């Protein structure tokens, strides 16, 4: 018989623990899932990354960004290289990931101290819907434990924004960040300032657009887009403001190449519109159309890391 506990019940049983966030972001077109875990300290994040990398299973890639763990995971089930931590074995891992309607089920294994992580720390996180424990569950000491953690199915939505300001007023980066932090739908994930071609004759001053990403439930996507549109419209000083929308974990190569080359090439609006149509980017005129190139390029640069903020010469 399986025991099912909600996060509040886990906390009542084991006490408060340390996981501050656990998000499962799904891209069903590509069969990819990204799991993002927010830890309270570097120590557990670093140990978990190293051990999950050894363990393998359905984890294809795992890295840490400060105290945040980011994992790219395949759907399905795979055998683990699991056991007491060694050069060949990892002490914690995920052997299965499945989509069940609007939920994601992941099966976690942990041994000794790592069993506390999968048995109490992760299940007690507020973002978890429920955790299923087997009858013989024991954690800590030298015990091996496994649980199924069920979380909401989330989708990554990237909003590109450009031309909300004028030479007299406003800043697109500030407007977009305020929008993201105030948005009641989804989870605000990232804010990126995108440096565009500084030689553009239509630039305000620095020639930057912005990309903001959210992890959001499917049923809230339209509400998120509507909120962002209304916010930009209310807070734009320009008659050229444009927003773009992209859903998914993988930026198409054509779109990424356009974003990068927009830092040095003078594109026409028609070029941006073609790339957007080819790559599934929705272009929305908020107060005008002048920001189309920058807003499309913002999506293309959203996953470029530090390169998003610079021009090609910065990285030669």
Q: What does each of the following model-derived ranges do?
A:
Residues 1-316:
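Conserved mixed alpha/beta catalytic, RNA-binding, or beta-rich assembly cores of soluble enzyme
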